[in-house]
Amino acid sequence: MTPILEIAQRRNLRTIEDSCEAMFVNYEGRPVGSFSDVACFSTYIAHIVTTGVGGLCTTNDPELLVCMKSLMNHGRDSIYIRCDDDQQAKESELFQIANSRFSFIRFGHSFRCTEMEAAIGLAQIEDRQTRMARRQEAANRLTNGLTPFSNHLQLPRARQGGEHGFMFYPLAIIDPAVQRNDLVLFLEARGIETRYLLPLISQPIYRKLFGNLDAQYPVAAWLNENAFYIGCHPEMSDDDIDYVIEQFKQYFGGRT
């Protein structure tokens, strides 16, 4: 983030931080999501906090907060920032609030969260320390079990000054003799769900708009061909993790 923020400061630009998969982790001593004007987090079903679908944005800028509240609610007048903002209002102020509730001051969207979705998400946030600790335990167990295959696999590790949220457990094939698709099919056949990494340059709409960008972004192109995810989440038991490790042992067999 440091180089990005330096560019933004020089050119007087706003920054939006894509923190989609990085809840509750730190970078250079600060929480991910606290560096920019706005940070975006996902609460999709597979993510660290899930409400089933959707996500959230955070900011410490009061003016942006008012705008964001309006945009998520069809562009309504942001007379309410919190649901109890009218508790101490005078009668004249209440009249103004009532008249403004259905006043639309900009084009907006229907991005509101239901109370049930919010309750599910808040319960997970309250339990975040336990849940994140278990993710880290699961990741450590996977790393210890898969390290013997490091001639074939690149295992995940946090960069200096950063932490890893382990929404998934990413792996990359570094042995030319091993085909990613072959390994993925082997794992899937044994009940281990996988997912390919999805660099933007590999998406059909980006290829349609910009053509083949592989030569300009060789790392993304390499990941597109060689990397994949396996699961790493708080509900995985040690037995589940050991089963995953055992399948890798069976696949690599005498290759190590």
Which sequence ranges carry the predicted segments?
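A conserved catalytic-core signature of glycosyltransferases
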Residues: 44, 52-54, 106, 115-116
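Hydrophobic "anchor" residues on beta-strands that sit immediately upstream
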Residues: 13-14
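PLP-dependent aminotransferase class I/II
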Residues: 1-3, 10, 26, 62-256
